[in-house]
Amino acid sequence: MAIERTFSMIKPDATKRNLTGAITKMLEDAGLRVVASKRVWMSRREAEGFYAVHKDRPFFGELVEGMTSGPTIVQVLEGEGAILKNREIMGATNPANADEGTIRKVHALSIGENSVHGSDAPETAAQEIKYWFSDTEIVG
């Protein structure tokens, strides 16, 4: 499997509970390496832009409110099959359906406060990385 990069986000519901280190450790323990990371407090415009794909969905307003409610950690992860590996470590979107030992099973509060986001494909990984990072901020 090829070395690839993916985008990862630790959401405000997790940062407010001081889970940044615990979640990052789970990612690193699975063989992913953090090659870029920063703490941001999303503006409404940034959240609406990042989640524009969901703008017509009924949960969009609640999503934007949640993402602007506190600090977020945005990261670029690197490793073999990083996109799929990150998705597996995160677990199902609904923590009730997530496998034991996944980030969402261990740390998520609900489907809306599910602690993390990760890219689902190479194209979205590239877009999401570019949304938050310049090339000079990614050091690996």
Curated annotation (Swiss-Prot):
Q: Which gene encodes it?
A: ndk
Q: Which reaction does it catalyse?
A: a 2'-deoxyribonucleoside 5'-diphosphate + ATP = a 2'-deoxyribonucleoside 5'-triphosphate + ADP; a ribonucleoside 5'-diphosphate + ATP = a ribonucleoside 5'-triphosphate + ADP
Q: Which cofactor does it need?
A: Mg(2+)
Briefly, what is this protein's role? Major role in the synthesis of nucleoside triphosphates other than ATP. The ATP gamma phosphate is transferred to the NDP beta phosphate via a ping-pong mechanism, using a phosphorylated active-site intermediate.
The family line of this record is:
Belongs to the NDK family.
Q: Which domain of life is it from?
A: Bacteria
- Provide the binding site for ATP: 11, 59, 87, 93, 104, 114
Q: One Pfam family of this protein, by short name?
A: NDK
- Please state the Enzyme Commission number of this protein: 2.7.4.6
Q: How does it assemble?
A: Homotetramer.
Q: Which organism is it from?
A: Rhizobium johnstonii (strain DSM 114642 / LMG 32736 / 3841)
Q: Which residues cross the membrane?
A: none
Its GO CC terms are: cytoplasm
Q: Mind telling me what this protein is named?
A: Nucleoside diphosphate kinase
**Cellular localization per UniProt:** Cytoplasm
